């Protein structure tokens, strides 16, 4: 056995060798390990990222936050966070994936072994998203199937699930005798709570399984499975349709919305600036958390998708374009939402503030109610829920793809072989489906709200973003990462990006993080139902399970590394030498970058790379 023995600068032996036939892995085993693959072209990457970041939050969260926080004045804090946090962290994650050609866990492990917990935390958040986000698709499918009827089932109070408190306010003869003090409900509310959810009195009573939702959930998982089962080869093709079709639906709904009576008042309500609201710190916190939510930051998705890029792809230009596309979509979606809410307000003779909602309330109560007031209501209902379905679908299967990528990069010898990927995807899909069945019980909505409020909350994303920019800006070194980016795209990005990594982003993330904690209010379902103490404990356990990965893996890696404290620290903040070095093209045949020849200048750079900025 022919080994080459070197000595590490700390005095520990470093052994590297090429295994002989029969040692460690035979040649047949090598051939079975498949390459990671790459996007066929840039458009596949752009559409995949667009499909991931442009989702339901653009339609049901941003417009509501804009109206609630001062209308047009909300854009001031929004764009401050957009330029100082959104673009810099978005670009950081995409560039990290492209530079390392690794998923979220192994990319951070190679950049800084001490902070590999950042990648593990993103996997935890991805896992939670895979369980609960797809429930929204099950609801959308249920509404879509219910739209293929002569009369929309949430239009009248004559259905079997309606109660004596149901009042159809569109039918003025039935609504005339109802006083404002009566305890009434609308048919659209009863359809949502009694027909779709069958909701119980609280989280303590989960009730029985809603088998129709369980079947819709199964269909959603089957669709997601076949969207990604062939890796980026299939994902890259599917997104041509799933990422672009929602824009067609959005344009159709926009044209319909702005032509409705009352649309102008709704749009004015959406954009009318109230500069006094900028004095409220809550407005700034909402702007910051919306940026992190809508850009899919700290979920590992951007790193995984970027890892399939060619090494010299201009990820800087792509990142900026995608960030602007995401925000522009949110802005246009606001016109769709508030033009229809303005129409509802005029038809019912009530203020817009009483019909404006966010989240599931907007998608499954306000909009279904709005389409009942339009001619050809079945058509508009189908178009809306198809748009909702595709907005959520590509976000879901791209998130699933990123979880699979992280797993395969962590265990390439075991998983990157013929047929193993299909089995892995099937196993994750079945496991997530079985866990998701808990959320389609009669009390499942209470569990869904816990996941949504705590598991992927702004607090978690702000915490991880803080460590990401500290790792790249201060530990690995912002200048060093700029050198890596320059090697990939041919020039250095705008200096504001580096300034943001070093100062602006960590400062804003830290301030917003502590403010979020100080202003924490316990979750209430429908602003009425208070969870029991053990329910809130489960919620905080979901939140801390991701954030705890960072300090936990710092401790674990320290304990597993030998040497004095100083030597261990130095070794754990030294990047992996197999990472591409500036001026040297990364190997295309899977061989180690260490075996590539380099000039004296490059060797000097490699020696310098061992130093850190800590």
UniProtKB/Swiss-Prot annotation:
Residues 589-601 have a biased composition (Polar residues). It is found in: Basolateral cell membrane; Cell membrane. It is a multi-pass membrane protein. Predominantly expressed in the liver (sinusoidal hepatocyte plasma membranes), also present in the renal medulla, where it localizes to the basolateral membranes of collecting ducts (particularly at the papilla tip) and the thick ascending limbs of Henle (at protein level). Some expression is detected in the leptomeninges, but no expression is detected in brain parenchyma, brain blood vessels, ependymal cells, the renal cortex and the intestine. GO terms for biological process: gamma-aminobutyric acid transport; glycine betaine transport; neurotransmitter transport. It catalyses: 4-aminobutanoate(out) + chloride(out) + 3 Na(+)(out) = 4-aminobutanoate(in) + chloride(in) + 3 Na(+)(in); glycine betaine(out) + 2 chloride(out) + 3 Na(+)(out) = glycine betaine(in) + 2 chloride(in) + 3 Na(+)(in). Its main location: membrane. Residues 138-210 are extracellular. It comes from the Eukaryota. Residues 574-602 are annotated as: Disordered. Residues 1-44, 557-614 are cytoplasmic. One of its GO terms (molecular function) is gamma-aminobutyric acid:sodium:chloride symporter activity. Keywords: Cell membrane, Disulfide bond, Glycoprotein, Membrane, Neurotransmitter transport, Symport, Transmembrane, Transmembrane helix, Transport. The chain crosses the membrane at residues 45-65, 73-92, 117-137, 211-229, 238-255, 291-308, 320-341, 374-393, 423-441, 458-478, 499-518, 538-556. Glycans are attached at residues 171, 183. Disulfide bonds join 157-166. GO terms for cellular component: basolateral plasma membrane; plasma membrane. Interacts with LIN7C. Belongs to the sodium:neurotransmitter symporter (SNF) (TC 2.A.22) family. SLC6A12 subfamily. Transporter that mediates cellular uptake of betaine and GABA in a sodium- and chloride-dependent process. May have a role in regulation of GABAergic transmission in the brain through the reuptake of GABA into presynaptic terminals, as well as in osmotic regulation. Probably also involved in renal and hepatic osmotic regulation. This is Sodium- and chloride-dependent betaine transporter. The gene is Slc6a12.
């Amino acid at each position: 056995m022919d080994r080459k023995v070197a000595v590490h600068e700390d005095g520990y032996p470093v052994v590297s060798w090429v295994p002989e036939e029969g040692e460690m892995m035979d040649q047949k085993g090598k051939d079975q390990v498949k390459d990671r693959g790459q996007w066929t072209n840039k458009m596949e990457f752009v559409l995949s990222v667009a499909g991931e970041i442009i989702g339901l939050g653009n339609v049901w969260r941003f417009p509501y936050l804009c109206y609630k926080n001062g209308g047009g004045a909300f854009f001031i804090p929004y764009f401050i966070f957009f330029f100082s946090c959104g673009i810099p962290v978005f670009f950081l994650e995409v560039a990290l994936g492209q530079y390392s050609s690794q998923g979220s866990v192994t990319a951070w492990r190679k950049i800084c072994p001490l902070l590999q917990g950042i990648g593990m935390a993103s996997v935890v958040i991805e896992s939670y998203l895979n369980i609960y986000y797809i429930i929204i698709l099950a609801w959308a499918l249920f509404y879509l199937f219910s739209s293929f009827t002569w009369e929309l089932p949430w239009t009248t109070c004559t259905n079997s699930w309606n109660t004596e408190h149901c009042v159809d306010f569109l039918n003025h003869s039935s609504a005339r005798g109802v006083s404002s003090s009566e305890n009434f409900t609308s048919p659209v509310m009863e359809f949502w709570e009694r027909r779709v959810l069958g909701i119980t009195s609280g989280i303590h009573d989960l009730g029985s399984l809603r088998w129709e939702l369980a079947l819709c959930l199964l269909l959603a998982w089957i669709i997601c499975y076949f969207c990604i089962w062939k890796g980026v080869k299939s994902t890259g093709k599917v997104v041509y349709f799933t990422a672009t079709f929602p824009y067609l639906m959005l344009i159709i709904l926009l044209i319909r919305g702005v032509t409705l009576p009352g649309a102008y008042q709704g749009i004015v309500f959406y954009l009318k600036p109230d500069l006094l609201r900028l004095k409220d710190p809550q407005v700034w916190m909402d702007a910051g958390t919306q940026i992190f939510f809508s850009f899919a930051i700290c979920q590992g998705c951007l790193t995984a998708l970027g890892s399939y890029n060619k090494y010299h792809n201009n990820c800087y230009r792509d990142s900026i374009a995608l960030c602007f596309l995401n925000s522009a979509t949110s802005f246009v979606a606001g016109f769709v939402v508030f033009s229809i809410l303005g129409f509802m307000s005029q038809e019912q003779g009530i203020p817009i503030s009483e019909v404006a909602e966010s989240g599931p309330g907007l998608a499954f109560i306000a909009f279904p109610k709005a389409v009942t007031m339009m001619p050809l209501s079945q058509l508009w209902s189908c178009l809306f829920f198809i748009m909702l379905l595709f907005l959520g679908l590509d976000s879901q299967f791209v998130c699933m793809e990123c979880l699979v990528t992280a797993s395969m990069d962590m265990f390439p010898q075991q998983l990157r072989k013929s047929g193993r990927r299909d089995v892995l995807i099937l196993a994750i899909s079945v496991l997530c489906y079985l866990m998701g069945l808990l959320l389609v019980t009669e009390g499942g909505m209470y569990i869904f709200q816990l996941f949504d409020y705590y598991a992927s909350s702004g607090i978690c994303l702000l915490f991880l973003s803080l460590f990401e920019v500290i790792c790249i800006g201060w530990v690995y070194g912002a200048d060093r990462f700029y050198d890596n980016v320059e090697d990939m795209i041919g020039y250095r990005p705008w200096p504001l990006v580096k300034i943001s990594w070093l100062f602006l982003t960590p400062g804003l993330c830290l301030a917003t993080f502590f403010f979020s904690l100080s202003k924490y209010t316990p979750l209430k379902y429908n602003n009425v139902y208070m969870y029991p103490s053990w329910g809130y404990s489960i919620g905080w356990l979901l939140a801390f399970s991701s954030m705890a990965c960072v300090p936990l893996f710092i401790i674990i890696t320290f304990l597993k590394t030998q040497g004095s404290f100083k030597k261990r620290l130095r070794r754990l903040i030294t990047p992996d030498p197999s990472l591409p070095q500036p001026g040297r093209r990364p190997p295309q045949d899977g061989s180690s970058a260490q075996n590539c020849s380099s000039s004296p200048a490059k060797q000097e750079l490699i020696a310098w790379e061992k130093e850190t900025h800590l």
